[in-house]
């Protein structure tokens, strides 16, 4: 198992807790698809801790009343040799 997959287990658990317990208490308000929590889940499943944290934070900061929102998928790995995220 790749080390970043082990490190990402804690943030994944927190996001899943948020989605199962806290999110149902509030009306839907995310302006993007996938939702910010789904985006963060995918980011932590796809990227290392630091990149996933940055992508998730940047997405949450952009999710505000002044944003158009819309479709915003998690970017894939860049695939550059020697720049692996594991």
Swiss-Prot record:
The keyword Flavoprotein does not apply. Coiled coil: none annotated. Residues 66-86 are annotated as: Disordered. Its main location: membrane. One of its GO terms (cellular component) is plasma membrane. Pfam families: YidD. It is a peripheral membrane protein. Keywords: Cell inner membrane, Cell membrane, Membrane. It is found in: Cell inner membrane. It comes from the Bacteria. Could be involved in insertion of integral membrane proteins into the membrane. NCBIfam families: membrane protein insertion efficiency factor YidD. Belongs to the UPF0161 family. This is Putative membrane protein insertion efficiency factor. It comes from Chlorobium luteolum (strain DSM 273 / BCRC 81028 / 2530) (Pelodictyon luteolum).
